Amino acid sequence: MEEKVETPANGNKDRFFTPPLIIIYVTVFIDLIGFGMVIPILPFYAESLNASPFQIGVLFAVYSLMQFLFAPLLGKLSDQYGRRPILFISILGSAVGYFVIGFANTLFLVFLGRIIGGITGANISTAQAYIADVTTRENRARGMGLFGAMFGLGFIMGPAIAGILSKYGVHVPFYCAAVLSLANAIALYFVLPESLKPENRRARKDGSNRIQQFVGALKERQFGTINLVYFLLITAFSIMTYAFVLFTAYRYGLSAEQNGYLFAFVGVISVIGQGLLFGFFVRRLGEPVLVCIGCFLMSASLFAIPFVGPLTGGLAALLVCCTVLSLGNAMASPALTSLGSKITAEHEQGSRLGIMQSGASLARAAGPMIGGVLLNNQFNSIDDATVNRTFFTASAIMAAALLVSLFAVRVVRNVQEIS
């Protein structure tokens, strides 16, 4: 793959919306459309292959487990060889994973596709490192906030498209996601410039292995505290993401198409929160305060979800809970990512953000596994009792994240003094 290192990617950092930054946002957006198409459809697809709620949880978990194992590696490779080739290969691999799932006629092949997609989809830290390369420390929080908004946009378009396509068969959204990823990889190859100059790349061998780097980074007081809160947040949110489709199908009787539209609504709220409100509030309150506010909103909304239903507030009550939950996540998640980036040296952005996203991937693996155990009853189905304990557990985890945030507020405030 021919390397294209363009000095404007590093030279125009005083101007926020540079061409490389716009291109990486478009690339991430297209990548996340494909990802967003999978979430509301996968539970119904797995159920068509006679999967139990627990097995569906494992399907969600195995994807993130692969990301946990491979995110630091891809981040480190991007520090050595540049961001562009890693992004290209990983997005191309995502297309392969989607094709495998689309052609699957057994649960084993669905698992295989999820494993392939998880390995090659561990590129979030590389994209974040690209953003760190082309932004200044002063506007990095804004850059990460807009990166989070790309997630929201992906969760608007992806689930909505999946909902429409699911009417033609549960396989169709996966074929569409595969074609979209393939087109994205081709476009990236021709238009995305490299952001990391050769002189800023790390040597291949640095005298320590990945596990030592991982443990060493987490032992640091500031970085470790940020990662603990981030891990708890992602765990709770992943329990909800896994359980939500099964919950709405059970409590409201929503179909795959209707769940796609509901996830699209959540995406709209996420875009508003991360794309508009986050930048406004972070300038006035700072990242540490937004982390605390976000954790509180998420805990409260997760606690309230089991109490809503057709006879208790109807769909409107559920939408209110989803709105509060999404806004809470829109405040806390990019604030934590921004803090993690600010305390990291420039030449370690890829590997450190890879470590942070690796922990998040472990949380995304743990969340569905926990949810799968809690939501599954003795008859391999769900009921009111399993719904209650699943969402109450997620709420308790966010309450713990809030307590850690409040206790460690001095630690994370020190980041602002350092930066």
Give the label of every model feature segment.
Residues 113-153:
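Cytoplasmic helix-loop-helix junction between adjacent transmembrane helices
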Residues 6-18, 193-229, 251:
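Juxtamembrane intracellular "pre-TM" segments in multi-pass secondary transporters
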